[in-house]
Amino acid sequence: MGSNPTPSASVLYMDLSFILKRVKGITLNSKEVKKGYLFFAIKGTRFDGHNFIREAEERGAYAVVVERPVSSKVPVIIVEDTRKALGKSAHEFFGKPSERLNVIGITGTNGKTTTTHLIEKILLEAGEKTGLIGTIYYRLGEKILGSGRTTPDQITWHRTLKEFYELGAKNVVAEISSHALDQYRVYPTRFEAVLFTNLSQDHLDYHKTMEDYFASKAKLFTEYESKVKIINADDTYGKRLLKITHGEIITYGKKGDLKILNFRTDFRGSALRIAFKGKEYEFSTNLIGDFQAYNLSAAIAYALWKGIEPDLIQRALKCVNVPGRFEVVHSDKFTVIIDYAHTPDAVENVLRTARKLSKGKLISVFGAGGNRDREKRPLMGKAAEKYSDLIILTSDNPRDEEPEKIIEDILDGISEKDKVIIEADRRKAIKKAIDMAKEGDMVAILGKGHEDYQEIKGVKYPFSDAQVVKEILGGDGCIGKD
């Protein structure tokens, strides 16, 4: 971009397009400001960027974008919403990349990661280079471009889309979190398709109420352009979404446009029979779990809408690996399941399937994240009690909270306290579960899935459930990468 000298300080109300042609970069982090950069003052949950304008000036900011009048030595551009202004500016600064790509956005409480991987696999099978943005990583083929938040900030989002485009991608499939929608992190992306999986309790530490949570999710369907909207018609909030969204809509579920006729699952995988536009199709996959019926249906609905042949869809679904999602570890006598389930609904879904597949007892090991929604903790305990013969409560990512206090919150939802063992050390808890497992039993380790760290008091220590299980089982364990 241009290298014009910084103009004299003034308060401006103008189209940011004029300024964007004259700056070298844009940022919302005052510590990243360089000479000639445009700084956006964002008011966050912990910090207010308006308090860091002086630092941005000292680092050479060309101008600052704010929501309220401030004293500054550089031009001040006042806008109604700096988050939206940042999104629009990043979109323009990086060449409007979403207009050159087919961007598929997926939102919902559970199923986002699996559904993004399914759609990515289908598009790759169709010969279309496809990027993925999500909880585990941001990647294009084998190239990992980054990781962090499920959905990155506005600058990272639009810059990543640009990188995908420059690397030859035709499509990008992305998880869109409720936080991202509330904070306009993907604004003003033009989507090819947007998908809704489901909504159940999570993130109430941030959204406060389920109504606020739903309102954030709904933004993807009411405030963004998309060619098609694909919605779970069996979900209560999905039905509500149908009443407020417009344009081309495809529903999926037992009563959807894409109708689930039959689904069966066991340790060999799953089979799904559906009806869509007067035709019946059957698909099989290595993925396990009753909940996969909806993840598969969402991905198939998109693929059929796009005109991808059913035979090609089947080839893609035959073997899918989603790290930390119902990951099966086989030993000589029993089975271990590793899953990211960290909401009441996800815990119930995973343990219901585990109960169904287990020939013996079901031992569950889990905790809950610190500094997050406390209300869901007893509900997770209640869900675990419903299906488990034995529950070992332990730490997840306690963050700044004491693990014992989190465990107490979970314990409040469990009535049969005699089926509970408390072991705050997660490694010891996993070992205890494996040591107690007998032939035919199943051990379900929930909450962290693919994560390779445990966050305690601001420090992320190396920790992987899969690695710990492998170390404990030694040569007896085989982690399936189905």
Swiss-Prot record:
Gene Ontology CC: cytoplasm
Molecular-function annotations in GO: ATP binding; magnesium ion binding; tetrahydrofolylpolyglutamate synthase activity; UDP-N-acetylmuramoylalanyl-D-glutamate-2,6-diaminopimelate ligase activity
Short sequence motif named Meso-diaminopimelate recognition motif, residue ranges: 396-399
The residues that the entry says bind UDP-N-acetyl-alpha-D-muramoyl-L-alanyl-D-glutamate are L28, S30, T150, T151, S177, Q183, R185
One Pfam family here = Mur_ligase_M
The positions annotated for binding meso-2,6-diaminopimelate are R372, D396, N397, P398, R399, G447, E451
Keyword annotations from UniProtKB, A to Z:
ATP-binding, Cell cycle, Cell division, Cell shape, Cell wall biogenesis/degradation, Cytoplasm, Ligase, Magnesium, Nucleotide-binding, Peptidoglycan synthesis
Described by its record, this protein's role is as follows:
Catalyzes the addition of meso-diaminopimelic acid to the nucleotide precursor UDP-N-acetylmuramoyl-L-alanyl-D-glutamate (UMAG) in the biosynthesis of bacterial cell-wall peptidoglycan.
Q: What is this protein called?
A: UDP-N-acetylmuramoyl-L-alanyl-D-glutamate--2,6-diaminopimelate ligase
Taxonomically, what lineage is the organism?
Answer: Bacteria, Pseudomonadati, Aquificota, Aquificia, Aquificales
